[in-house]
Amino acid sequence: MEELQGYLEKDGSRQQNFLYPLIFQEYIYTLAHDHGLNSSIFYEPMEIVGLGYDNKSSSVLVKRLITRMYQQNSLIYSMNDFNQNLFVGHNNSFYSHFYSQMVSEGFAVIVEIPFSLRLVPSSEEIPKSQNLRSIHSIFPFLEDKLSHLNYVLDILIPYPIHLEILVQILQCWIQDVPSLHFLRFFLHEFHNWNNFLTPTKSISVFSKENKRLFRILYNSYVSEYEFVFFFLRKQSYYLRSTSSGAFLERTHFYVKIEHLIDVCHNHFQKILWFFKDSFMHYVRYKGKAILASRGTYLLIKKWKCYLVNFWQYYFHFWSKPYRIHINPFSNYSFYFLGYISSVLINPSAVKNQMLENFYLVDTLTQKFDTIVPVIPLIGSLSKAKFCTILGHPISKPIWAELSDSDIIDRFGRICRNLSHYHSGSSKKQSLYRIKYILRLSCARTLARKHKSTVRNLLQRLGSGLLEEFFTEEEQVISPIFPKTTLFPLHGSHRERIWYLDIIRINDLANYLDWS
């Protein structure tokens, strides 16, 4: 444990000072407001509790919020006095919700600074990679590695029950005591109002207004767990390690780090000897992780027991064992990054000849396969109000006030992004149903705007109005390969294509990961 403590203390970049004064800077809230407008492909105007506001009025409210924070001397030093609340003491629900949302978003921008600085290369070293690193690059890795493994641990990363655990973990990254007190005060107040957490069984579902702050806290918790977990694993291997770090929703700070692990000959090898497995791979996105191994069932079961005890003794909360499932790759499919992935076994017969004798040899080959999860996608379309839970298209009332070109552009952009992101599916025909839902939802939205029916609208404007929904994937989304033909490539619906320009998961698939 002494080496573990030294490993934690050696990383001096984990701590930053003097973040608290930034809470009183107006430009912080401007950055948070701009991020909220431009972070989604749906791009819906930001509204608070059903009331709209423009940029000028929001700027005035931000200045008023900063003034109130300056005047509240008891904000940090009188934590026990909750009768006078800075954010919800106002009689108008609009102001209370606006203040709470802006403080949450502004503090999230501030807390991102230590994480961002860790990913900015120093002036002495030369950056080895550029910003862009496609999410699709993980799938060729899985295709190359997982087809040769035996077992997989499908892990739902447990969440701390008490919010104080998240604050204590963040304390490892930030030494600014006033900022931590401010965060503790803010979380405690929201927890009392039952407003910060939605009334669900999982802490991982936060209200829409405060989701960004939660992602900061959750990401710091996951980073801490992986920081210690990988240290223990690295102590028992003479292997070259390549690690890639990317802060959630901050892909522009992506940096690839390569280093050679120094193996220590000490008691760690005696403790971890039964975990040695040179064919183990770990992949995580948000709250879901995959730990795959070529070892035996006994070895993978030991890893499960170790993870449960690790969360219990290091983070001081109980991790339910049923959140970690052990499954053989031969008959198991798992959902990851918007795809349903599995390892298929393909039998084949090979004809051999020796002199005048012929004989057949039956062989089994394993192939990593990815398909589009149609039913979950329909569920996310239903949550986004494009269709019913059964998949029947409906109009989008919030977009009915836009111009016809804007409505068509938004629906078409969503459709193209889905085709782009799911280009790695081996069965692209399943996307036709999703395109049909979006196309008819667009038509009904236009009909709602013009107070007409879909049939009359198409007769008046022409069926070519929605022709871009039928545009083949190869004609629209290829920024790498030039468009050389007007006809789709033969058999392209069966070919898997991984693109190098996808820096974020599709929003519809993203809904599934956070639901």
UniProtKB/Swiss-Prot annotation:
GO biological process, one term: mRNA processing
UniProt function note: Usually encoded in the trnK tRNA gene intron. Probably assists in splicing its own and other chloroplast group II introns.
Keyword Transmembrane helix carried by entry: no
Keyword terms, alphabetized: Chloroplast, mRNA processing, Plastid, RNA-binding, tRNA processing
UniProt cross-references to InterPro entries, sorted A to Z: Domain_X, Maturase_MatK, Maturase_MatK_N
Localization in the cell: Plastid, Chloroplast
GO cellular component: chloroplast
Similarity-based family: Belongs to the intron maturase 2 family. MatK subfamily.
Source taxon at top rank: Eukaryota
Protein's recorded name: Maturase K
Organism: Trillium undulatum (Painted trillium)
Pfam families documented for this protein: Intron_maturas2, MatK_N
GO MF terms, alphabetically ordered: RNA binding
Main location: plastid
